C-alpha cells in the first residue's frame, strides 16, 4: 500500500480555521507606506505626550481614527499597542505640561540618547494613574484591540533602563502600573516584556518578545 502526500491550501475565511489572534503582529513606523507581507494584526507604539497633550485632554479617538488613515492596506485589522514615556533616540514621550510642573528629566547617551523621567515623582505617578484609567475606559471594550502591552516604564516601555539601572522605576511604581492596568483592562489580555519581579507572579499576564525571531533575550540568533 502506498500513500501520496497532498498539500491542502486553505483560503482566508472567517471561522475557526483562522486561529484568531495568533501569529505575528507587524510593526508600523511613520516612514512606512505599506506592509511588505499580508497581515491581519498590527502593532503600534504611541507616546503618552501624543495621547494627552494637555491635562485630561485625551486624544484616544483621534489616534484610533488614524490607524486606517495611515495604513489603508490594513484597514480593520486587530491591533496591539504600547504607550511609552521614553523611546531612546526619539523625542520624549512625557507630556510637556508634566515636565513644566517640575518632573525631572534625566539625560542618558545609551541607544542614541534621550531623557529618562523620574518615574517615582508623585506628580508623574498620579497623572499616569489617571491616564491609565482613562485609557482603559476608552479601549477596554473595543473588540478591535486584541492585546495591550504594559509599556510606560523604561526604555521603549520595556520595563528596563539597562545599563542605566539607576534610572528605572521603584518596585512601588512598578506595582502601581501593573495593578492599575489590570483594573483598567479587565476584558483584555495584557502583556509584559519580561517575567521579572512583580511581573512574574500573575497568571493572567502574558509576555511578548519584540525581536523574535531575529534574536532572543540571550542574544542567540
Regions found by a protein language model. Give the residues of each.
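Short catalytic/ligand-binding loop motif for oxyanion handling, primarily in non-cytosolic enzymes
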Residues: 51-52, 87-94, 154-160, 198-201
Amino acid at each position: 500500500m502506498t500513500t501520496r502526500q497532498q498539500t491542502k491550501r486553505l483560503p482566508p475565511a472567517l471561522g475557526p480555521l483562522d486561529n484568531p489572534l495568533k501569529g505575528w503582529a507587524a510593526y508600523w513606523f511613520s516612514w512606512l507606506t505599506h506592509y511588505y507581507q499580508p497581515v491581519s494584526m498590527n502593532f503600534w507604539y504611541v507616546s503618552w505626550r501624543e495621547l494627552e497633550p494637555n491635562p485630561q485632554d485625551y486624544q484616544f479617538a483621534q489616534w484610533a481614527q488614524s490607524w486606517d488613515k495611515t495604513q489603508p492596506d490594513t484597514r480593520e485589522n486587530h491591533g496591539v499597542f504600547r504607550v511609552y514615556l521614553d523611546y531612546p533616540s526619539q523625542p520624549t514621550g512625557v507630556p510637556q505640561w508634566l515636565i513644566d510642573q517640575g518632573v525631572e528629566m534625566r539625560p542618558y547617551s545609551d541607544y542614541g540618547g534621550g531623557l529618562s523621567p523620574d518615574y517615582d515623582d508623585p506628580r508623574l505617578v498620579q497623572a499616569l494613574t489617571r491616564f491609565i484609567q482613562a485609557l482603559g475606559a476608552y479601549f477596554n471594550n473595543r473588540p478591535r484591540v486584541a492585546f495591550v502591552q504594559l509599556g510606560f516604564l523604561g526604555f521603549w516601555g520595556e520595563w528596563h533602563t539597562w545599563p542605566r539601572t539607576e534610572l528605572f522605576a521603584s518596585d512601588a511604581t512598578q506595582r502601581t502600573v501593573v495593578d492599575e492596568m489590570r483594573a483598567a483592562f479587565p476584558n483584555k489580555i495584557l502583556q509584559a516584556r519580561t517575567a521579572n519581579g512583580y511581573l512574574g507572579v500573575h497568571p493572567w499576564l502574558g509576555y511578548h518578545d519584540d525581536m523574535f525571531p531575529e534574536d532572543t533575550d540571550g542574544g542567540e540568533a
